[in-house]
Curated annotation (Swiss-Prot):
It is found in: Cell inner membrane. This is ATP synthase subunit delta. NCBIfam families: ATP_synt_delta, PRK05758.2-2, PRK05758.2-5. It comes from the Bacteria. Its main location: membrane. Belongs to the ATPase delta chain family. It comes from Pectobacterium atrosepticum (strain SCRI 1043 / ATCC BAA-672) (Erwinia carotovora subsp. atroseptica). Gene3D superfamilies: N-terminal domain of the delta subunit of the F1F0-ATP synthase. SUPFAM superfamilies: N-terminal domain of the delta subunit of the F1F0-ATP synthase.
Amino acid sequence: MSEFVTVARPYAKAAFDFAVENQALDRWQSMLAFSAEVARNEQIAELLSGAIAPIELAKTFIAVCGDQLDEAGQNLIRVMAENGRLLVLPEVLEQFIQLRAALESTVDVDVISASTLNEQQLSKIAAAMEKRLSRKVKLNCKIDKSVMAGVVIRAGDMVIDGSIRSRLERLADVLQS
């Protein structure tokens, strides 16, 4: 997977720079999302890993995408097909999203709790994370009954585990030592 990250980086950066220059971040993210979904399709993935000429592969891929791609998006597909890189489109999308988040100074924060949190709780979490990270945050809330109570907050590689489950596990470790 790390190979895909390395391969996808220049394509994501080129698409991002072009999108910023043309004030088309939403459009490009949409095109990349659609293209990534097409590339994830089993039949298309099989086609991409086959021995089809790059020009034919690009034509087929663009035809499948239809009017979801503008001329610049089609050019990206042609270049990636020529270099045999269409399989990394999902990673190109991920890196594009990360570049956009960095530009907009936002970060995705996963909030995992045992039950649904109310608006007041969510706004307190958002405010605390914005202060801690010095960025705007976008909360992604998930319910996981195994948390029992409390919350687990993930932002990038930072994890704040305030769940009862983790406290019980730590207590069990202390009692066993």
